[in-house]
């Protein structure tokens, strides 16, 4: 009689910031073969494991499968297991709205909600117009991996803005105690012009105020005595 055993282990550092996958194989309670993702190949621990290691290390698809298990097994199990929130890695998303073209009322346009640097991957992004959810004209990219285990996604809304419309990007994520909302308000060209004029007037006012204070300061100082001899002609 003999007993063959397999143990698959996952080790986590700071949530899933770093994952290590270990595959251990035993014959009659003696470990004879091991795969460690930090090593990247099978290593024989006894003479019995030598032929296994040589065979499996020569098969590229087997090694690729073992490397993929960090995501397909370890990461998946971590995210699906009921781990206490205090032990999970959570990264809050950054949310911003941008317009694809210069704003013009009553013209077709595209609003882009950029949601970046969040973890875990599960996230819900919705668009609202004047408090009502928009379901048509919504297009989303696939989740994009940043390379540091965090993710980003773009959710776009095709729209034709009317004066006074308020568009809201609404984001739900496990890292948030309450949803994050970012608003974008449609403005007429005259309103934008008035706003820009107001900003320009404010800037000019600050410049003239500073110039006036400078001149007043110079006058208050007055003459500082006669010039040195030889400078008066």
Curated annotation (Swiss-Prot):
Involved in the presentation of foreign antigens to the immune system. Residues 185-194 are annotated as: Connecting peptide. Belongs to the MHC class II family. It comes from the Eukaryota. Residues 81-184 are annotated as: Beta-2. The chain crosses the membrane at residues 195-215. PROSITE patterns: IG_LIKE, IG_MHC. Residues 1-80 are annotated as: Beta-1. Residues 93-181 form the Ig-like C1-type domain. It comes from Rattus norvegicus. This is Rano class II histocompatibility antigen, A beta chain. It is a single-pass type I membrane protein. Residues 1-194 are extracellular. It is found in: Membrane. One of its GO terms (biological process) is adaptive immune response. Keywords: Adaptive immunity, Glycoprotein, Immunity, Membrane, MHC II, Transmembrane, Transmembrane helix. It holds the Pfam family C1-set. One of its GO terms (molecular function) is MHC class II protein complex binding. Residues 216-233 are cytoplasmic. One of its GO terms (cellular component) is lysosomal membrane. Glycans are attached at residue 14.
């Amino acid at each position: 009689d003999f007993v063959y055993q397999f143990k698959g282990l996952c080790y986590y550092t700071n949530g899933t910031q770093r994952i290590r996958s270990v595959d251990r194989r035993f014959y009659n309670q003696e470990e004879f073969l091991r795969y460690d993702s930090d090593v990247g190949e099978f290593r024989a621990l006894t003479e019995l494991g030598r032929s296994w290691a040589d065979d499996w290390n020569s098969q590229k698809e087997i090694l690729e499968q073992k490397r993929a298990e960090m995501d397909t097994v370890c990461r998946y199990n971590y995210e699906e297991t009921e781990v206490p929130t205090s032990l999970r890695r959570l990264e809050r998303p950054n949310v911003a709205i941008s317009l694809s073209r210069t704003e013009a009322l009553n013209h077709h346009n595209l609003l882009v909600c950029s949601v970046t640097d969040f973890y875990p991957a599960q996230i819900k992004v919705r668009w609202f117009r004047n408090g009502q959810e928009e379901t048509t004209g919504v297009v989303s990219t696939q989740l994009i991996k940043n390379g540091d285990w965090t993710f980003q996604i773009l959710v776009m809304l095709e729209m034709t803005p009317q004066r006074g419309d308020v568009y809201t990007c609404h984001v739900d994520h496990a890292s948030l105690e309450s949803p994050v909302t970012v608003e974008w308000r449609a403005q007429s060209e005259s309103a934008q012009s008035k706003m820009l004029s107001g900003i320009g007037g404010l800037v000019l006012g600050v410049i003239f105020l500073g110039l006036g204070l400078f001149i007043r300061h110079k006058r208050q100082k007055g003459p500082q005595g006669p010039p040195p001899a030889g400078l008066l002609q």
